[in-house]
């Protein structure tokens, strides 16, 4: 159903990712950016408050009619849970406690994971570092869709289905592209999450558990905030691999929209990324950028030139230095 996309292959490139050279050039010109590379302890209190708000919402929905459970899971819970996944993104970069307390950050990530209902924070950390070091690398960067996704989701309707099912593909893709041995922290993450889910069921009931899980599923699928999944690296303009978004939803997402800035300086917490853009404005103002994630979702589904194949892909090579 719907017209078929024109792209039938990834955009293969044989050059290094652009962030390495730009980082080096910007730091040579603006060494003061190094002062922005520091922990953000405010994340500890913000994330804890988000956890408590979701805990309160579990109590508030426990006796609602099912239609209102689903309604509030999409309208409210989805925003909170998607925001929490991006808090986990901040934690994966060790921003709450700093790099010298990396283990504290891993435990805090497990804590932040609890309202989402599905364990993933420890695994996300492992794969996300690969995404930065080997951006677009075949068989390493699991942010790149599989060949099956590009081949099958090739019509307007199928692309819409793909957007709705994004959380499923993000969960399963690592198993097919770059499987890794399970670590003890991943086991702890899983066991802790299962225990919390059981507690939610027995204390609040099935409606609260469904609310929590639906909030994650809906919030990571066809949802305005989910536009960032596509906006960050899908090639809407040939030759451009990473795109920033400067709209208001950055307020809910720890500035993940500042994505060129983030990949240029992954050791700068989200709070300081607008300062990076301000300091080095001549570098970022000229790059392609978005002001609406909703429009990104619409264009992805409706534009026949865009599909899951619209990613720049490169053969695997040596690791990039992120310092």
From Swiss-Prot:
Superkingdom to which the source organism belongs: Eukaryota
Enzyme Commission number: 1.14.19.17, 5.2.1.-
Keyword Mitochondrion: yes or no?
Answer: yes
Which residues are recorded with the post-translational modification Phosphoserine?
A: 307
Q: Does the keyword Lipid biosynthesis apply?
A: yes
Q: Which CDD domains match?
A: Delta4-sphingolipid-FADS-like (cd03508)
Q: Which Pfam families match?
A: FA_desaturase (PF00487), Lipid_DES (PF08557)
InterPro entries from the entry? DES1/DES2, FA_desaturase_dom, Sphingolipid_d4-desaturase_N
Q: Which stretch carries the motif Histidine box-2?
A: 128-132
Picking any one GO molecular function of the record gives:
retinol isomerase activity
Q: How does it sit in the membrane?
A: Multi-pass membrane protein
| Known catalytic reactions | an N-acylsphinganine + 2 Fe(II)-[cytochrome b5] + O2 + 2 H(+) = an N-acylsphing-4-enine + 2 Fe(III)-[cytochrome b5] + 2 H2O; all-trans-retinol = 11-cis-retinol; all-trans-retinol = 9-cis-retinol; all-trans-retinol = 13-cis-retinol
| Motif window: Histidine box-3 | 259-263
- Chief place of localization: mitochondrion
Family of the protein in this entry: Belongs to the fatty acid desaturase type 1 family. DEGS subfamily.
The role this protein plays is:
Has sphingolipid-delta-4-desaturase activity. Converts D-erythro-sphinganine to D-erythro-sphingosine (E-sphing-4-enine). Catalyzes the equilibrium isomerization of retinols.
| Quaternary structure (record) | Interacts with RLBP1; the interaction increases synthesis of chromophore-precursors by DEGS1.
- This protein's name: Sphingolipid delta(4)-desaturase DES1
Which species?
Answer: Alexandromys fortis (Reed vole)
Q: Which gene encodes it?
A: DEGS1
